[in-house]
């Protein structure tokens, strides 16, 4: 099953930027961008400075890059 693309990858591709373009424009390392896009590193746990720089380079809001967090509610045993 192919995993869906990260919001970061979708935003970057929408602007037809390469990962290298984004690294250069944001000042965030190419390796970090690759890891966020491949979900080897969680962008939600990245520094605000990094996410803000990436968002600025992609002309979007920080919230547009964060991945949804699934909340699991505890069910009480009946």
What residue spans do the PLM features occupy?
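A short, Lys/Arg-rich alpha-helix, primarily the initiator
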Residues: 1-16
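Short, basic-rich loop-to-helix N-cap that marks the start of a DNA-contacting helix
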Residues: 40-56
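Recognition helix of helix-turn-helix/homeodomain-like DNA-binding domains
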Residues: 28-44
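Short, charged recognition helix plus adjacent turn
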Residues: 56, 63-78
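Short coil turns linking two alpha-helices in DNA-binding domains
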Residues: 18, 29-32, 47, 61
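Conserved hydrophobic/aromatic packing and binding residues within compact polymer-binding modules
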Residues: 8, 22-23, 33-36, 65
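Alpha-helical residues within the helix-turn-helix
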Residues: 13, 24, 56
């Amino acid at each position: 099953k192919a995993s869906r693309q990260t919001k970061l990858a979708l935003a970057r591709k929408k602007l037809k930027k390469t990962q290298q373009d984004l690294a250069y424009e944001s000042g965030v390392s190419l390796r970090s961008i690759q890891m966020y896009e491949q979900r080897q590193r969680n962008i939600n746990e990245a520094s605000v400075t990094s996410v803000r720089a990436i968002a600025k380079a992609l002309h979007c809001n920080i919230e547009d890059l964060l991945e949804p967090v699934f909340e699991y509610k505890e069910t009480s045993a009946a």
